[in-house]
Amino acid sequence: GVALLIFMIVIYVDPKGNLIRAGWWGILGLIGWTYLVCAFIYYFVRTDLKKLILMWAIFLVWSMLRCKLTASGEPLLNIPQNNALYTVTDQILNIGTGAHGALTMGGIILSVTELKLRDKKIPFVAFTTIVAAILALGGLITNNFWIISKIQATAPWVLYSSAVAVFLYGVIVWLVSKGKASWFKFIAPAGEATLTCYLVPTILGNIFMLFGISQIRPEWCHSGFLGILSCIIFSLVCVGLTWCMNKLYLKLKV
């Protein structure tokens, strides 16, 4: 495998005739940098919820400052690229708008909170439902000033995504505690062969483009409730294909 990777690096040439070189790392790079920063924060803070929530709030406020306002089209804090602060946040720590940091810190807080509530009488599912409602309300309020955008990594996107994740996590924990873990077996391939499942949509997308299928999709596939439904169906198809590949012993390993 290592020899194959070295061979591919040596023979790689981009459409402009350039050899392989470092470039923007994409979403996986953003995730990696975010995990690194948040891991360091957790290393020093550990399970101190007050400090964890403070760091989450800092990331969230930073996203509000860095993202473009809907009304003006400009961010509240526009940092020049030759500025020292820009160098630290965007070139050394690579936190960008802070949205990914807020999402990751939210996950850490949720995990720590679950551990702390295990020995108490407060039902975890009730707690997560209340928190999800508060986060959704925050998303509704901030949406008056910023758009909901994953690409721009805005605050409303962070809050709405967090609300959905927290609520579903609480429901899943509750169902598992009731012995219903088997209900989620149909999506197990996504966790057992994560990298394979991650690449399946890209493979399908290229196949669709090759045969012109992507050009004949109806408009309702792109937006609204039916658009969401089509995304869910496509996701399940990808999980199903991953399951088939596992059965054929086709699996990518890291």
Predicted segments, located by residue:
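Alpha-helical transmembrane segments and their immediate juxtamembrane cytosolic regions
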Residues: 1-254
